[in-house]
From Swiss-Prot:
It is an enzyme of class 3 (hydrolase). One of its GO terms (cellular component) is extracellular region. This is Probable mannan endo-1,4-beta-mannosidase A. GO terms for biological process: mannan catabolic process. It catalyses: Random hydrolysis of (1->4)-beta-D-mannosidic linkages in mannans, galactomannans and glucomannans. Its EC number is 3.2.1.78. Belongs to the glycosyl hydrolase 5 (cellulase A) family. The gene is manA. Keywords: Carbohydrate metabolism, Glycoprotein, Glycosidase, Hydrolase, Secreted, Signal. GO terms for molecular function: mannan endo-1,4-beta-mannosidase activity. Disulfide bonds: none annotated. Substrate binds at residues 142, 178, 254, 317. InterPro entries: Glyco_hydro_5, Glycoside_hydrolase_SF, MAN-like.
């Protein structure tokens, strides 16, 4: 999701997955099994949340409760991971850089949480792709996908992150980007970038899964012709999903931003389930949210997702909690722990998952 005040950003910990019951097996690398995910000895449907802000926390205790490209060095106390300046890329491996992510991963390992680690953001919040565009003198946003200097710096960051966590079972998947778009582009542009980047990641780490992080745009299956189903944003969901080095599909849902009805979200979910079923890969309903009436509007999507063949997990946007500094960021979509919204969106949803699958 694009946020004007806060971010979904480069080096994002975009999602956290947890089994809706105590794992029956030993911790290990997450994988796919047909149209489902397998996590720590369980195969089935899983639930989780998006918590982009965890990677920026400076208080380790806050991490236990619960990333950023720049063109100039931020002020003291700001976490950032990569600096683009004077045509050069510098990876910040210090205490206010990747060492922060180290602790997030360590905490996830300790608490049995699986992380989706994202490498760049389509949007400008906290830098994103346009930080690369500006840093290497490219013309516009869409140059990110094919500019040689940009891709060299992007892969430098990928290598720096992947190499730190190749042995961590807390990593659910590596994600190419948050909501990559190439408006007005031929679909070959994103396809070629997805194919080459996912192949590169697999060459560094063949054990962890790789996903795109896209919104699911560009799909013929069950299409009603509305904007999200079109190819305007340069994406072809089914074609991209068929790339061998992409392990599962991702799709998002924000009707208020896309000009669709809330009920339409059920069609969108079913369409992607059908596309993933045709591809023989599971789908992750990776982001969804509204700014009000969470229980009334979002729980029907959860029920549809749980009962749609081809969809094997969902992550609502976004998790909220009370930190040492106060409440975690709230963009209006936030569902805070301990609230009535949390009960319907999480507690009741997990109970439904457990009941459907016979998990205790």
């Amino acid at each position: 999701m694009k946020l004007s005040q806060i971010l979904t950003f480069a080096s994002l910990l975009s999602g956290a997955l947890a089994a809706p019951g105590k794992p029956h097996g030993k911790p290990g690398f997450a994988s796919t099994s047909g149209l489902q995910f397998s996590i720590d000895g369980q195969t089935g449907y899983f639930a989780g949340s998006n918590s982009y802000w965890i990677g920026f926390l400076t208080n380790k205790a806050d991490v236990d409760i619960g990333f950023n490209d720049v063109n100039t060095v931020p002020g003291e106390g700001t976490v950032y991971y990569q600096l683009h300046a004077n045509g050069k890329s510098t990876i910040n491996t210090g205490a206010n850089g990747l060492q922060r992510m180290d602790y997030v991963v360590k905490s996830a390992e300790k608490h049995g949480i699986k992380l989706i680690i994202n490498f760049v953001n389509n949007w400008d919040d906290y830098g994103g792709m346009n930080a690369y565009v500006k840093g290497y003198g490219a013309a516009d946003h869409n140059d990110f996908y094919s500019n040689a200097k940009i891709q060299k710096a992007y892969r430098q960051y990928i290598r720096a992150v992947v190499s730190r966590y190749t042995k961590s079972d807390a990593v659910f998947a590596w994600e190419l980007a948050n909501e990559p778009r190439c408006k007005g582009c031929d679909t070959d542009v994103l396809y070629d970038w997805i194919k080459s980047t996912s192949e590169y990641i697999k060459s560094l780490d063949a054990k962890h899964m790789v996903c795109i992080g896209d919104e699911g745009f560009g799909l013929e299956t069950l299409s009603d012709g509305s904007y999200p189903f079109t190819y305007v944003e340069g994406s072809d969901f089914a074609r991209n999903l068929a790339i061998p080095t992409i392990d599962f599909g991702t799709f998002h849902l924000y009707p208020d931003s896309w000009g669709t009805s809330h009920e339409w979200g059920n069609l969108w979910t079913q369409a992607h389930g059908a596309a993933c079923q045709a591809a023989g890969k599971p789908c992750l309903f990776e982001e969804y949210g509204v700014t009000s009436d969470h229980c009334a509007l979002e729980t029907p999507w959860q029920k549809t997702s749980l009962n749609t063949t081809g969809v094997s997990a969902d992550l609502y946007w976004q998790y909220g909690d009370t930190l040492s500094s106060g409440p975690s960021p709230n963009d209006g979509h936030t569902v805070y722990y301990g609230t009535d919204d949390f009960k319907c969106m999480v507690t009741d949803h997990v109970a439904a998952i457990k009941a459907k699958q016979g998990w205790v």
